[in-house]
Amino acid sequence: MRIGIGIDVHPFAAGRKLVIGGVYIPGHDGLDGHSDADVLLHAISDALLGAAALGDIGLHFPNTSAEFKDIDSMILLKHVGKLLAEHGYAPVNVDAMLLLEAPKIAPYIQQMRQNIADALGLQVGDVAVKATTNEKLGYIGRKEGAEAHAVCLIQGK
């Protein structure tokens, strides 16, 4: 068994769609980034890669590559799952935390959990997604961006 941690941050940007955990959330500015800027999936991808000592998402999906411009981060997460399998590992569970003041994420959490489970070949009960605010402190509190943290356990096959 091996454990990995991932953290990602993206600023909000007008004119972008907000996608978190593979779920489109209407009525709010999206996150800015080279890909779709899915902060949750990026943190999970980094945690999985770290657990297997396979680098990070910047190594595998560089933001200098046109190939990954505006790419759906669910594609990246599925690729990370394949990389793990190629190296003899399989995800066991995912525990992730979102930090943002708005929008409220609770109505979308179940779909996020299902999307992540499906992408990684897990049961939905093996995926936890939680959300909290920053109590109006810092860049999160000022609604300038969103942050995600993830811890993932993997095992050798």
Curated annotation (Swiss-Prot):
Cofactor binding remark: Binds 1 divalent metal cation per subunit.
Cofactor needs: a divalent metal cation
Protein residues bound to 4-CDP-2-C-methyl-D-erythritol 2-phosphate: 8-10, 34-35, 56-58, 132-135, 142
Molecular function GO labels: 2-C-methyl-D-erythritol 2,4-cyclodiphosphate synthase activity; metal ion binding
InterPro entries: MECDP_synthase, MECDP_synthase_CS, MECDP_synthase_sf
GO biological-process terms attached to the record: isopentenyl diphosphate biosynthetic process, methylerythritol 4-phosphate pathway; terpenoid biosynthetic process
Residues the record lists as binding a divalent metal cation: 8, 10, 42
Keywords: Isoprene biosynthesis, Lyase, Metal-binding
Pfam families attached to this UniProt entry: YgbB
EC number of the protein: 4.6.1.12
Site (Transition state stabilizer): 34, 133
Pathway connected to this protein: Isoprenoid biosynthesis; isopentenyl diphosphate biosynthesis via DXP pathway; isopentenyl diphosphate from 1-deoxy-D-xylulose 5-phosphate: step 4/6
Quaternary data: Homotrimer.
Family from the record: Belongs to the IspF family.
Protein name, per record: 2-C-methyl-D-erythritol 2,4-cyclodiphosphate synthase
Organism: Chlorobium chlorochromatii (strain CaD3)
